[in-house]
């Protein structure tokens, strides 16, 4: 476990302060008595837990026990601090383990092979979910919340840094933002070298790098994709540290000063990761119109999971927005090339050799999210395949060099991508009873409710409290439903043959000129929606005209099916691609700006948003500017003004849109320094969403699901109209009777 006292963790109250102090004193004990005490405590705790989860209770007693635990949860949720979270975790584990013990010992008396097939399939999926739940609590219950260590030495003593910007097929208009921002980082210029690693071997990139003064590196092949590109650059550079940025990840000027302090404090630190923050919406946010309103898919990982990994010294390298110490990286043979998720595998290798990895939850760079659902799915397929490859070839639960906390964190990251089959099981399990009459639970309906409800409610409320602003309840099911069908085959193939499959590059940038429904990608969601609708029909029929003695069982399965319909309908909604007409995403920001008009007037205003093509502005004092007028925009930093020629392309009262005229390379670099590279550009948006409330989140997902059904209806009508318009009509004479 990482020393929490040295990293100044976030403290929420006196109880946490006392606990942190006790942990620090305990860590100073000699190793032998400390180990004995830990082992003895674990054994006693396990015995107590086993007694609680295995205690046989009748229906009344189980309901009473569940009610008492639920009341305790309601009280604990109102208590601030992480000790209350730990108590919630304990109650959740009790409820879930009691359920699983009862499930394995009292509900598996299947009578037919159909019951056995569906019943054991569901149990296997539930067991997987329980393991992921337990490992997830270990990861996230006590995030470290590391804070920066500021550099205390003079700049002349700071280490040398090589900045690697690997690129393959990204447009120069995207990559140049990252290049300009890397050059603008606050670091001694004689100790900072920027390298563009071009696996696309493009001459215009070479010429651009020559003009702006950065090093251009290309190789003759693309062996091992990104990992091979980075390793080739390691051979021709010599900086003490390497800062890595994907081609579309634009660093702030404070990136190195915020990140390097920990390396100078901890000589065993090999890698420090910062969040991947995105200034454009991902396909879920774009297609569902939830950008900045609902936490996106990645916010849980970068907002909470990585912070939790940091407590156990198990921070993952994520391929970008990170700093690596050169010496340990060379010691493990460079960036890992055995799998397609070279980043996570590299971190695992570093941890196995005893090096530390760290996470700093302060966004110091931002990039483009995948624009379309198809690109998003392709990216997740690569991640899933790579994690399965690591699990198969370098399993963190086996081998030397890792502590148990590290093993759990790495294993859970890999097991997470195995959700494809369990998610499909959960989405179809109630249909086994409603359609086929299979008894997947060999127990009374009321006993099922008495054990299942506490398990589900406790896990939902506990995760809601832990995840807070980084993941709203029920959205995990939506994300998994969209991806489950697509990640299942590559995961299974990678487990059987880890060498199968190649590295697919995630395309970034581009426009979607019209809205359309992606019927091809939506096929799995439509199938799931259809079979659940069929199951709903069967269930309603049984509820009205079936045996009254099975009414409660039918009602339980109908409720489950209705929930699955909400989730699958939301997945259908994601498949409706919204338009994206801007080639350059706009970033919301309020910056003071002066506008010099053609007639000599100087007006004050504030930016509303910006891109590399222009500004959205709000003029002060009720002024206005005519559309089409040419102006100069003045931005200031540290008392120095920078002027940019622009033309007003939109004007409505005090609100105007200004598009830049042709800017020189120096002006483009200065614009990036004054906008994207500002130290505080992304901090205000980090974790700023509304805290999760399960009922509100259910309404949220439910409304999206209803919208998905309407979207499907409109898309179906549109396809019918197109089909009818393409139907050829026969000339009148072909319809006449012939003699």
Curated annotation (Swiss-Prot):
The lineage of its organism: Bacteria, Pseudomonadati, Pseudomonadota, Gammaproteobacteria, Pseudomonadales. This is Cellulose synthase catalytic subunit [UDP-forming]. Belongs to the glycosyltransferase 2 family. The keyword Cytoplasm does not apply. It comes from Pseudomonas fluorescens (strain SBW25). It is found in: Cell inner membrane. Substrate binds at residues 246, 248. Catalytic subunit of cellulose synthase. It polymerizes uridine 5'-diphosphate glucose to cellulose, which is produced as an extracellular component responsible for the structural integrity and rigidity of self-supporting mats characteristic of the 'wrinkly spreader' phenotype. GO terms for cellular component: plasma membrane. The gene is bcsA.
């Amino acid at each position: 476990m990482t020393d929490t006292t040295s990293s100044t963790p976030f403290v929420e109250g006196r109880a946490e302060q006392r606990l942190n102090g006790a942990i620090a004193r305990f860590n100073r004990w000699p190793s032998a008595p400390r180990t004995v005490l830990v082992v003895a405590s674990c054994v006693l705790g396990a015995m107590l837990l086993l007694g609680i989860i295995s205690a046989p209770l009748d229906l009344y007693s189980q309901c009473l026990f569940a009610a008492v635990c639920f009341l305790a949860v309601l009280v604990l949720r109102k208590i601030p601090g992480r000790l209350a979270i730990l108590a919630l975790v304990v109650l959740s584990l009790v409820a879930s383990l009691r359920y699983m013990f009862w499930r394995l010992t009292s509900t598996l008396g299947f009578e037919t092979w159909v019951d056995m097939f569906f019943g054991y399939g569901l149990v296997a999926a539930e067991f997987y979910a329980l393991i992921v739940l337990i490992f997830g609590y270990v990861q996230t219950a006590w995030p470290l919340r590391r804070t920066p260590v500021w550099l205390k030495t003079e700049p002349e003593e700071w280490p040398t840094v090589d900045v690697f910007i690997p690129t393959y097929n990204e447009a120069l208009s995207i990559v140049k933002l990252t290049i300009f921002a890397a050059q603008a980082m606050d670091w001694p210029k004689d100790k900072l070298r920027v390298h563009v690693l071009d696996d696309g071997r493009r001459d215009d990139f070479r010429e651009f790098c020559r003009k702006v003064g950065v090093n251009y590196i290309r190789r003759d092949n693309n062996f091992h994709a990104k990992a091979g590109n980075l390793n080739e650059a390691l051979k021709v550079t010599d900086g003490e540290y390497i800062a890595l940025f994907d081609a579309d990840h634009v660093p702030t000027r404070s990136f190195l000063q915020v990140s390097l302090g920990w390396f100078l404090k901890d000589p065993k630190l090999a890698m420090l990761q910062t969040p991947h923050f995105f200034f454009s919406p991902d396909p879920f946010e774009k297609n569902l119109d939830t950008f900045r309103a609902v936490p996106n898919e990645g916010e849980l990982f970068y907002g909470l999971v990585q912070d939790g990994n940091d407590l156990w010294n198990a921070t993952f390298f994520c391929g970008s927005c990170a700093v690596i110490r050169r010496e340990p990286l060379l010691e493990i043979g460079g960036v890992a090339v055995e799998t397609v998720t070279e980043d996570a595998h590299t971190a695992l290798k570093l941890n196995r050799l005893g090096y530390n990895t760290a996470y700093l939850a302060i966004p110091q760079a931002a990039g483009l999210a995948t624009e379309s659902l198809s690109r998003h799915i392709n990216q997740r397929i690569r991640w899933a395949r790579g994690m399965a490859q690591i699990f198969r070839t370098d399993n963190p639960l086996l081998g030397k060099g890792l502590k148990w906390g590290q093993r759990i964190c790495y294993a859970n990251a890999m097991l997470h991508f195995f959700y494809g089959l369990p998610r499909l099981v959960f989405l179809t399990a109630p249909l086994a009873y409603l359609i086929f009459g299979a008894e997947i639970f060999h127990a009374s309906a009321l006993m099922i409710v008495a054990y299942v409800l506490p398990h589900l409610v406790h896990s939902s409320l506990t995760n809601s409290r832990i995840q807070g602003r980084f993941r709203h309840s029920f959205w995990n099911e939506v994300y998994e439903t969209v991806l489950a069908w697509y990640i299942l085959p590559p995961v299974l193939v990678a487990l059987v043959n880890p060498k199968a499959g190649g590295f697919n590059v995630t395309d970034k940038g581009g426009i979607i000129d019209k809205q359309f429904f992606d019927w091809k990608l939506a096929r799995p969601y439509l199938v799931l929606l259809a079979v659940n609708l069929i199951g709903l029909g069967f269930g309603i029929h049984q509820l009205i005209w079936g045996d009254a003695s099975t009414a409660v069982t039918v009602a339980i399965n109908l409720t489950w099916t209705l929930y699955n319909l909400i989730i699958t309908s939301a997945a259908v909604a994601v498949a409706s691609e919204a338009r994206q007409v801007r080639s350059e995403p706009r970033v919301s920001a309020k910056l003071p700006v002066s506008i010099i008009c053609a007639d000599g007037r100087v007006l004050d205003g504030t930016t509303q948003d910006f891109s590399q093509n222009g500004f959205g502005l709000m003029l002060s004092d009720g002024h206005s500017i005519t559309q089409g007028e040419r102006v100069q925009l003045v931005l200031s930093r540290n008392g120095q003004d920078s002027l940019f020629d622009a033309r007003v392309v939109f004007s409505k009262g005090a609100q105007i849109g200004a598009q830049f005229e042709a800017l020189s390379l120096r002006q483009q670099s200065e614009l990036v320094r004054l906008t994207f590279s500002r130290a505080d550009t992304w901090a205000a948006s980090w974790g700023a969403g509304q805290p999760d409330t399960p009922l509100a989140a259910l309404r949220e997902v439910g409304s999206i699901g209803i919208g998905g059904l309407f979207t499907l209806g409109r898309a179906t009508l549109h396809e019918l109209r197109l089909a009818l318009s393409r139907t050829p009509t026969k000339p009148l004479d072909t319809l006449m009777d012939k003699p």
